[in-house]
Amino acid sequence: MELMKEALDASQSEVITVAVRRERLFNEQGKSLLEYIDLKRYTILPNTAGCFTAEDAVRVSRLGRELLEQLENPGASWVKLEVLGDKKTLLPDPVGTLQAVETLVKDGFDVLCYTSDDPISAKRIKDAGAAAVMPAGSPIGSGQGVLNINNIVLCLELLKENDPDFPVIVDAGVGCASDVALAMELGADGVLLNTAIAHAADPIMMAHAMRKGCEAGRQSYLAGRIPKKLYATASSPMEGAISYIPGE
């Protein structure tokens, strides 16, 4: 728990997502997980990890809201929605996900929705009322980074069309700081992290690296990268060059 606390501090995160489980809230020393989290500093985001049906995801979301309402945490109406398709890939069930979004939005939730990198599915989730869409870079916990850059770019384009402030967060598959930087350079508003830090040889150092990758990627996006071209463009002027130029 202390390692988790130090890693969170190193990352400078503002939101912590927590899976809702039927487990004891206290560890063997009688301490609660929440004792290690500064509730005035962090917003707690309950998630429905492990749910394979829309019905289960809705029930878990409501349980999470009840818990956070007792803590007066601003994330009480938030839920990170996951409706998984199978245990092997942990890829989302698109039909169940959409059903759960519609139900939870009607129930007053601000839904931050995990989905695949399919731009059409992402757009339908937004149209159903999700507060944020979270396309996967690659399968959960795989560490493969952003496998399909084009699809993430299309998701960003569709979701932010006429709505540039709509939050798009790359969720799942991140393995290292360069993955975070790439996601932010593409224009994502944030990246969800867990395994890449928790399973790193030095989680605290990796959390530092992820923060720097996030900052660098965002600054690069805002600065505006040069366009990619097939041929070279000399960075120094050719006029006055003391050399023979082939073909001229």
Residue spans of the language-model regions?
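Alpha/beta enzyme core
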Residues: 1-15, 28-43, 52-171, 175-195, ...
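A short beta-strand-loop structural module common to alpha/beta enzyme folds
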Residues: 14-22
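Short, motif-level signal for alpha-helix interfacial/capping segments enriched in acidic residues
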Residues: 25
